[in-house]
Amino acid sequence: MIDLKLHIDESFYKEEIRDGYTISSEMKKLWAVELDLLNEFMSVCKRNNIRFSADAGTILGAVRHKGMIPWDDDIDVMMLREDYDKLCKIASKEFTYPYFFQTEDTDKGSLRGHAQLRNSATTGILYAEKEYKYKFNQGIFIDIFPIENLSEDTKEVEQQCNRIALLRKKYLKYANWTEERYVRPHNKLKAFIKKIYYLLMQPYVRYIENPHKIYKEYEKELTRCKDTKTSKISKLALGKYENRRIWNRKDLEETIEVPFEMLTIPIPKGYKNILDTFYGSWQEFKIGTSTHGEIFFDVNNSYHKYINEKE
């Protein structure tokens, strides 16, 4: 287990049963890295007067379990666009190794659509991408989502979400022909053919369908209503139009402090309305319904071990 800045008592790492679910020692170690990331994130936000709150399952965990949902393995936070932009401006000087603030501006090719704070001494690689050995930072992370202002016109919001989803699909498609995301096939003949095609694609990808420029269009579309203080807000970075993701601004503007494992974190004052909208019957739960098992985690080794290893 790597050293963490956050002091965590050894007893935390013991296997235990919560709400009928067995939490392994390995899961506890993953939680510890994520809690350390969250603690560092909160420190930076506090120093710079940046507002944020827990998001989604992290709100639910705080309210229902006073910490992580026993079968969950990630932490999400959110902030209004103005605070998100402020964070992006100061992040590179505030977060130092092993903490890495990742956006497309700080780490080309990552293309997540939102920010992530990662621990560079660990590994958190999507299984779907593990064999590709992408060079961007793939340490264990917490997600940081911007919350956008929404038009009062529902049809306009639907159209905006469709444009966001299209741009997201487009930049990911053409990113596969950039140096950051190019994947060389193992078969020598296929590798040769793909390399030729890659070279032929370069003028097109560089000057016509440049994924980095498309990504900027995507970000611009996210912030279409940036300068208008609207009554409705949403997490648009996922590119899906869902009523459950549309919330009232008044529910998010103020926060309250609540226990979360060994930390105290802010959640929206109107958390009940947000949870009702997002989850429905959130006070009831089904064991094992929210884990993100599609990610390969290693709390002992940096992602460099895996992206540099030979086949």
Could you say what each language-model-derived stretch is?
Residues 1-10, 71-82, 177-196:
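Short N-terminal signal/transit or membrane-insertion segments
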Residues 2-21, 29:
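N-terminal regions that are enriched for targeting/export leaders
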Residues 6-12, 53-58, 239-245:
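Short, functional N-terminal and low-complexity linear motifs
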Residues 14, 22-46, 91-152, 171-280, ...:
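Conserved catalytic core of two-metal-ion nucleotidyltransferases
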Residues 42-75, 79, 84-85, 250, ...:
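Active-site nucleotide-donor binding segment shared across nucleotidyl transfer reactions
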Residues 87-89:
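Conserved SAM-binding loop
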Residues 154-160:
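A short secondary-structure junction signal
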Residues 165:
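A contiguous, mid-domain pocket- or channel-lining segment that forms the substrate-recognition surface
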